[in-house]
Amino acid sequence: MSSSRPAHSSSSSSRTRQSSQARILAQTTLDAELNAEYEESGDSFDYSKLVEAQRSTPSEQQGRSGKVIAYLQHIQRGKLIQPFGCLLALDEKSFRVIAFSENAPEMLTTVSHAVPNVDDPPKLGIGTNVRSLFTDPGATALQKALGFADVSLLNPILVQCKTSGKPFYAIVHRATGCLVVDFEPVKPTEFPATAAGALQSYKLAAKAISKIQSLPGGSMEALCNTVVKEVFELTGYDRVMAYKFHEDEHGEVFAEITKPGIEPYLGLHYPATDIPQAARFLFMKNKVRMICDCRAKSVKIIEDEALSIDISLCGSTLRAPHSCHLQYMENMNSIASLVMAVVVNENEEDDEPGPEQPPQQQKKKRLWGLIVCHHESPRYVPFPLRYACEFLAQVFAVHVNKEFELEKQIREKSILRMQTMLSDMLFKEASPLSIVSGSPNIMDLVKCDGAALLYGDKVWRLQTAPTESQIRDIAFWLSEVHGDSTGLSTDSLQDAGYPGAASLGDMICGMAVAKITSKDILFWFRSHTAAEIKWGGAKHDPSDKDDNRRMHPRLSFKAFLEVVKMKSLPWSDYEMDAIHSLQLILRGTLNDALKPVQASGLDNQIGDLKLDGLAELQAVTSEMVRLMETATVPILAVDGNGLVNGWNQKVAELSGLRVDEAIGRHILTLVEDSSVSIVQRMLYLALQGKEEKEVRFELKTHGSKRDDGPVILVVNACASRDLHDHVVGVCFVAQDMTVHKLVMDKFTRVEGDYKAIIHNPNPLIPPIFGADQFGWCSEWNVAMTKLTGWHRDEVIDKMLLGEVFDSSNASCLLKSKDDFVRLCIIINSALAGEEAENAPFGLFDRNGKYIECLLSVNRKVNADGVVTGVFCFIHVPSDDLQHALHVQQASEQTAQRRLKAFSYMRHAINKPLSGMLYSRETLKSTGLNEEQMRQVHVADSCHRQLNKILADLDQDNITDKSSCLDLDMAEFVLEDVVVSAVSQVLIGCQGKGIRVACNLPERFMKQKVYGDGIRLQQILSDFLFVSVKFSPVGGSVDISSKLTKNSIGENLHLIDFELRIKHQGAGVPAEILSQMYEEDNKEPSEEGLSLLVSRNLLRLMNGNIRHIREAGMSTFILTAELAAAPSAVGQ
């Protein structure tokens, strides 16, 4: 579908990328224009000009590239820093100073009387060797940063000045051709002057992280409210906000907490220009930004004159803010600020790495929003606390990603359900009027304020929609301007160029269009954005006279409302996909009536689907049974009542309980008392379809194993389902952790020489690695080398988080940045005393093979009880267990594919059926003779039978006696049923030369009865089909009947209906008959399944089926109870 916005591509993700890139480029141009205007105007700058700027057309925005380049250069290479620290730029080869801030000599080289023996204090200037400024430990640590690809892993580095003895945090980042180092004074009263490292910073955020992780999920609002509350308590700022960017780049204060007496900004929307694109780019590079005092005078940077380009300050926290931003802060009385970027995954399905390949390229990221802290007085936050806030923002981003996935699933399910309901309404009436006049209707498909349908030169309107004449005018405009497109979406009819937009007012701003034909069109309408937005902040007191040129949040909000005055909320990609899907269904429904139906091709597709699906499922099922019986891991299964119906040899060996002794016993009697509630919960959830993973419980031992103590299992609960996805039991795939736990217990008790255990090549020793309290890898045993391919000397003394494990540029690659954040949380929690056990973990080994495992982390303490690091134990499931899980997954995927295929086929069949119905209805009005009309009626009956069968696909278990197969009672003539049923086997009879003889009396054929004629027709056709299939070539099939009337009262008669179908030959195989009578527990054949369903239908009619086999002949005897139709009483 086309759009008034930049052209859309075929996929949602590419459409999003293109429109987003176009918006960013346009916004950057506007940012540069406004910046130039501000610099030239100074105090006379009129802030309201951004309204006119954002309304300017693309042609008016051309010719500004020079301003854009100058603006970006000024933002990134401004040569000014904030005065709370100083800055040095070092040449990477010589380690000499090539640039320094004007305050650096005073901060780093001033002589202190507390430091003796400083005869010749060092001087700081261009070319100074930085080793001369600091004591040896700090200078060595700084020089070590030269060899690191990612120098940020070392931050902060603690250094001490030679002259004053003052400690500083050195925060290093790499710029083009040099290292840029921020130096921030350490305040011993606030933080201990030790090389704390990143792990110590994680501790500061532990409480906040735990609070976020404990949230149930499903509410973005609750998640944002929690994070602002935790940051508020962690940092002590006066105001903390969660600031969210919308699709059109404008921002919204989504959550907020303030100290008492401060005006709230909750619900306030800002124009996109309030946070320029250049600033957003810098937030992607440097995810924490601090401004200590907006009134403080910036400090200049002195650079080596030999430098060809100014040094980039993108990664520096000290980078001075732009004067325009400082003015804005001053106006809103925010003297200090701290901002954390919230970076999330792009919504692109194609970027997901495969399960067995390392992620060669990280998933694309985007800036979701910011966590913004404001303070009404100068405020400095030390680096360790800023780092903790950055990590907290990363954890928050992981949960935002989860919320997106959950919202996407809920949204897709809702849209799919609505599409299905609308499709069903369409197929019943084959007219688009049904989805406008009925309930639900097209307004329920996507969020809108009104809708309309132009069909057959008539107009139908729903709620807030233009008048009939206006809709016709819009349709004419579409045909003239967008005649070649199949539709259009715009958030502003005015911007899209519709000449009548002004007459529509602000209640009709946005529109989405789907063309069914060139003259038949569906419309959706939206009102202006302001109607959707409410500011939750303080109301504006009319006595407050705001200067319209003064930069302030209230004026930002006013400017935003002006910008979006004639705009609606934008139409999202998923909404346009839903509209496009409905458009295709409508076009198919109306157009297929005019196209010939490829019935034979459809039959072949269905046949191939059944054969492929059954063969695959049978193979998978056989493999599952074999695996369960022979697996070297414990596997047990229970039915829906908790009774054991599966107990393999491995679990029998571990527990001492034989298979025959375990079968039939309740699972709760076989587990330790301490595990009863755990297993009970697992069983309950699994039967509801909620499968728990990595749950530990203890199994009782019996016989010779009784004295060995309980068996400790870590179990995955898998719901056992039938072909119709109905949960019929639970399978527990387990891993024996008894020996593993004994080793871990013994290990954690050892206080002295533990290396003998760690480096023992005994296969019982699991892979173990460890880190000291500063995050350096300190342990890596033989089993770990075998698992990963990385030797001990290649990882020891490297940063565990960042160099050994990371999602890029590390020895052991993780799948994603989210996985890296989770590993950080686990290790941090262990250092804080919350040890992790059997957490799901995965990594790529040296050869790129992905390893799924469990991770347990324990803290390491010395004799004084001081935490000195962590030990991490990895447990890898056996090959048999992994194979079993993969087979189970394949089975589930096959069942899902089959269900999806059947759902598609059902959907696809309805469209040609609608076309056939239209064709027959047209034929009836062409003057057919009696015989031709009779054939048309037979086709109608067969059509209704097929519709009935398609509707049965909704049944969970169609073969169950208690299934919800229903009867639709109506009057019919038995002749119509018999003729329609026989017609369904005549082609098969002709192919085998079989004669069908209907020896039915006139009285039977003309009898009018009351019941479900279509179901009876289905039953007869099933038994006739089987009879013809198992008759010899040249044989015969004879149909005879008997009717017996029984009077019940004066005007009610019941008819005992009996029909006999006799055919020659050996007859139907006994196996199929056993399946019909449910005497065979094997998977039923197609014929057995159809006869079983027909038998259940006969039972609903108070009837049954019998089969008689005689010499050379077989007979089906069908009985049912019908009511004589009122018009037939007395005949």
UniProtKB/Swiss-Prot annotation:
Entry protein name: Phytochrome a
Organism from which the protein derives: Sorghum bicolor
UniProt gene name: PHYA
Residues reported in the UniProt entry to bind phytochromobilin: C324
Keyword Transcription recorded: yes
InterPro entries per record: GAF, GAF-like_dom_sf, HATPase_C_sf, His_kinase_dom, HisK_dim/P_dom, PAS, PAS-like_dom_sf, PAS_2
Domain Histidine kinase: 904-1124
Segments forming domain GAF: 219-404
MF-aspect GO terms: phosphorelay sensor kinase activity; photoreceptor activity; protein homodimerization activity
